[in-house]
Amino acid sequence: GPERAEAAIGLRHAVRVLCARNQTSIGRQHAANRDHRMRKLMNAKVWLVGAGPGDPELLTLKAVRALGEAAVVLIDDLVNPAVLEHCPQARRISVGKRGGCRSTPQDFIHRLMLRYARQGRCVVRLKGGDPSIFGRGGEEAWWLRTRGVEVEVVNGITAGLAGATQCNIPLTLRGVSRGVTLVTAHTQDDSSLNWRALAEGGTTLVIYMGVAKLAEIRQRLLEAGMAGDMPVAMIENASLPQQRECRSALSQMSDDAQVFALKSPAILVIGRVVAAAQVVELVAMASA
């Protein structure tokens, strides 16, 4: 009868109201989820942090703060494990790259940083030395920024500086060396280096990743006109307790390194400042 029809109409109306409310609620939830995802994307950030040469006391305060805030830390091969004491809360992922050893593909590292950054997590890419000195920091920063990820670089003390300092070698010295040239021996094409400019530049030459190419470095510099008696310091494990140093001259550095059993990681410091440092040491010993 009429009462049943009226009840049915009322029921249908109630169902429509409930459905509308549910759709509104679902729509709001979708919008909230979308806004949350957008906020994460807008807040996507990666810190490229230099872990320094090895001695954990050479970390900067800013590096310690970034590690303390990190949710994810992607760790290079040459980072001292003691540095990781500053990020006990973080997920740690080893992405080591070392010449002659199995390495993590660079593209994989890029995508890992991007994935975690887009999740809104605090990502630290922890590199030995300084990110911008033979650490691919520039490449990684460019790759991330072109994908909308903010990048902040935290400098670290580079091994060339720390090793020289530990061996009492000033990289610049008035009247002896007017500058410093940092070079990597680990290149795809050795001919890309201007050996004559390196030999005649009048600066202290600091060579990274050169242990496997000592004989070639010696030959190239001699052929380019550098004096055979140019002082050389070969410094292994810069700034660490197991640091070792071998002093030599350019013409005989390959033979001396072999006798010394020089191993990577090591840096070469080539220049008159090496001899100047020895003079200072002798004077200090004589006056002691």
Protein language model features and the residues they cover:
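Class I S-adenosyl-L-methionine
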Residues: 38-56, 61-154, 162, 252-254, ...
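Intrinsic-disorder-associated, low-complexity terminal segments enriched in Asp/Asn/His/Tyr and depleted
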Residues: 22, 33-36
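Class I SAM-dependent methyltransferase SAM-binding "motif I" and its flanking Rossmann-like core
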Residues: 130-201, 244-247
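Short hydrophobic/aromatic-enriched beta-strand-loop microsegments
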Residues: 91-97, 148-152, 171-178, 225-234
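Hydrophobic alpha-helical signal/anchor motif
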Residues: 9, 15-17, 26
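Short gly/pro/ser/thr-enriched loop/turn and capping motifs at secondary-structure boundaries
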Residues: 81-82, 99-102, 158-162, 179-181, ...
